Amino acid sequence: FFVTPKNGEIKHIDEFVKPEDVKFLDPCMGSGHILVYAFDVLMEIYKESGYTERDAAAMIVQNNLFGLDIDDRASQLAYFAVMMKARSYDRRFLSRGIKPNVLAIKESNRMGAVVRDGLTTDAEMNAISRYLVDTFRDTKELGSIITVEPKDYDGYMAYLDGCDGQGQLTMEDADWLQNTRPMLKALARQAKVLAAKYPVACTNPPYLNKIEGRLKTFVTENYKDYSGDLFSVFTYRNLMFCKQDGYCGYMTPFVWMFIKTYEKLREFIIRNKSITTLVQMEYSAF
């Protein structure tokens, strides 16, 4: 999908980009406003490539849009918004069993033993279980600023599906199957989203300059140069979500451009990235 520039100059076109490869992440999706707008843009890209609206809607939900948020209610609204947007292009979409990659971030704080003798016997898979539980401590507070290592999360989820047990199960085994296993699968699914790299990452990050508790400790330890405000942390983190030559978009306060608190952020962007568009909003926009 290509729009000719107004000046008529065409410097470079990657003719081999497929629509399904244009994966779009909003790591602070809220109720999904940005995802819904991206859906319409992606729909035009698919239609330009010869897809029907019905097929494109399914492809966008399955392959293109990814969203995360720590707020369960906001995530439910985002889920609903994406599904209704797909439904607007395909009347039977809700009956097709397609689930969007729109997730409420979960944490592992209340999880007990994750390995059951006789049910989980694969050492590599058990190591992933322990990694997930350790990584997702306090993530209802930390959200998507955590970093996750890429692992075989698809294989891990398939492995969990095969841990059904045979014959008579103990109460502990039954509890693992009914409660622990679904949570591990949910953690693996969000780990897969957080570990991936995206051609496009766009968000309206949270604004918070008085950070306290576990979040303050984590930000100080991992994002000290960008800790003046939570939006600054997310600005940096979003860049880490992007593939090389990918695009990041933000709706943030404009103070990062001027005051000393955000000097390290400005230096990082200027020295390592390229700004294609910069719009200074009216103060009343916030």
Residue ranges and their predicted role:
Residues 1-60, 74, 205, 209, ...:
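Class I S-adenosyl-L-methionine
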Residues 1-23, 170-202, 214-216, 220-221:
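Flexible, glycine/threonine-enriched loop-and-boundary segments that flank and lead into catalytic domains
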Residues 7-13, 45-50, 135-146, 240-241:
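Short N-terminal helix-initiation segments at or just after the protein's N-terminus
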Residues 26, 67, 250:
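Conserved SAM-binding loop
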Residues 107-183, 190:
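Basic, amphipathic N-terminal segments
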